[in-house]
Amino acid sequence: SQNSHARNGDAKNEKIMSFEAGYGYRSRFFTANLNAYYTRWIDKALYDSDTMEYKVDDVNVTDRYTLNMTGANADHWGIELDFIAKPFKWIDVTGMFSWGDWRWNGTATGYYFNSAGQIMTDFKGGIIEDMANAGDYRANIKMDNVHVGGSAQTTAALGVNVRPLKDLRISLDWNFFARNYADYDIDTSNTGLGKEIVIGNPWEIPSYSTFDLSAGYSFDFGKVRATLSGNINNLFNQEYIADARDGANHDWESATRVFYGFGRTYNVRLKFNF
């Protein structure tokens, strides 16, 4: 993540409106929860930051700029389902499904600031000198129906936990992630300060599945009780993209800051209960 200390004097208090409804079912062998939600964020304060390069008297200068924005809105709505089934005493089956539709809406406005906190007039080192003309350099960021990035909007999971012996537990979990969008990008290469910027819908990162295996065994160790357990995460070493920043063409070829997920990982634990 990135941070900025540039002051946003136009920032407003964010407002949140949320509605949620759900239903739960309970029985000896089956438990389930169904939930629906809608949340609206109003006047969210956002920022975008990157580096710029320019020349001053034939000397190369590199600086960082920040675009402070206010007035953006976001709508999140969706459904969630989770359940636990216990068909036999020695087996549990768990599952979940979540589908959401999360989008930015509205027009955010803001100024570009250099690293010194000065309002920029261009990307070549120019700064505003007469605040009476500040409105000429205010950017308007149109964000209608732009998918929120950074988190999968469709997820599912299915797990089986078996206890073949009294002190032995083995679990296998399947996890599915889809409709994860890259974070939106504001392309300054074709943007003039003070003009409207239209944000395109970002690249949809390919969906993927992973499997996790875990096991645990409890036993007596002298006069104390001990448990040996371990996990193998991403059992089949699935390659996948976890996060990215959108590019000019809204596809994998132009995406930047692409982060791949972890491959297969292991851990082993030994616990003593006194």
Predicted stretch roles:
Residues 38-40, 61-186, 271-273:
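Gram-negative outer-membrane beta-barrel transporters
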Residues 1-41, 58-86, 148-154, 204-206, ...:
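Outer-membrane beta-barrel signature, preferentially recognizing the C-terminal barrel domain
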Residues 17, 135-137, 145-274:
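Conserved C-terminal beta-signal and adjacent last beta-strands/turns
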Residues 1-5, 54-64, 127-141, 188-197, ...:
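Flexible, solvent-exposed coil segments and beta strand-coil junctions
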Residues 1-3, 45-51, 100, 105-112, ...:
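Outer-membrane beta-barrel translocator domains and adjoining extracellular loop/strand segments
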Residues 29-31, 91, 168-169, 223:
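Secondary-structure boundary/capping signal
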Residues 28-30, 47, 217:
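N-terminal/domain-start segments enriched in small and hydrophobic, helix-friendly residues
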